[in-house]
Structure formats: structure tokens, C-alpha cells
Amino acid sequence: MAYRMQGSILEVCTCKVLCPCWIGEDPDGGTCDSTVAYHVDMGSVNDVDVSGLTLAVAVHIPGNVLKGNWRVMVFVDERATSQQEQALTQAFSGKLGGPLADFAQLFGEVVGVQRAPITFAVEQGKGHLQIGTSVDAELEPYLGTTGAPTTLHDTIFSTIAGAPAYVGKAPSFKMTNTGLGIDVDIQNHNAIQGSFLFEG
């Protein structure tokens, strides 16, 4: 097995709540500008320990999420050693096969890879995501009648059977990237946090 990683995924985007991409439908307005961050709680790639690190992408999705042709900027946690950075980028680029190769097939163009300080401080849909000077998002979950966070199960992005994805919104979401031609500054749009397990 080339890799095994388990942790939390966070997606913030320009779609309204709830982002249609999570059930395979077209994004609101026909396109979607999004940040997807993967924080690895525990994991290794080719025997390189990558626990505690985060890899994120800023993406422009030109249509239905499953049709691909995404334009992508990759951000690697600045705390990663050169060996850890290489391991993470190899896995998430699909070069090591498995489910991450399926994910990487959605990429049409990778415009660059950058090291950046990444803050991933989110629990049950509430918290903060910051990626250098490129992304800053505050996150709030929706709550059900019992006061517990509203959740989704078995979405197209689910990799752990039965694991919840917490439905929320971003009171503030800012994302700028000249390589992607993105300049977003919006309020109260989609934010979803879930769990992932990748083995390949």
C-alpha cells in the first residue's frame, strides 16, 4: 500500500448553501470557485509520516463537478519537510494510484504548487481556515432542532461509510489567486466539513 491517510476535509465555495456539488449537481451560477483543504490527522505516504499536515487546493470548477477540467492551485503546509511535501504532492496528484488518482482526474490544469502557512481549526463545522494570504474563511454550522449540527451522509465525496459531513456557511470567505483569476469576497455561502480515509 503506497498511502493511507485519515483526517478532515473542509470545502468552502461560492455556491449558496447547500453546495450542489456534494450530490453531483451543477454548481449555482454554472461555475464554482472553491477551496478544499485536507488535514491529515494520521497517515503516511510511501512510509513517510505526514500526520498533522494539511494540503489544500484553490480551484475554479467550470461546470458540473464530476466533469472535471478544474483549474487548480495546490498549497502545501509550510511545516512539511521537502520529503513530506513530495510525498503529499505525489499522492494528491494521482501518481500513486488509488482513490486519489480518481480525484486527480478531475484536474484539467494545475497552475502551480505553493508552500504556505495553513490554519485548519475546524470542528463539527465551526472554526477558521486560513491559507497564507490567499484564503481566509470563518465557518459556522447549521443546527437542527436538538441543537446538534446538521449533517449529510453518503455524499459523492464520502470515503468513510456513515461518517457525517457538517453543513454550514461561511460568514466571511475571501480567496484571491492571480494564477486562477479568482478574487472572491463574499458572505454566508457554502461551507462543509467532513472526514476522509484514503488508501491506495
Predicted regions and their residues:
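N-terminal ordered "arm"
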Residues: 2-45
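Sterically constrained small-residue positions within well-ordered secondary structures
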Residues: 6, 29, 65, 120-122
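Generic structural motif
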Residues: 18-20, 41-45, 60, 77-79, ...
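Short amphipathic beta-strand and strand-loop transition segments with alternating hydrophobic
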Residues: 21, 57-59, 116-121
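Aromatic- and glycine-enriched beta-alpha-beta binding-site module
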Residues: 32-101
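Low-complexity, flexible helical/coil segments
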Residues: 47-54, 74, 108-114, 156-158, ...
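Charged linear interaction tracts used for macromolecular binding and regulation
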Residues: 70, 74-152, 158
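Extended, charged low-complexity segments
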Residues: 142-200
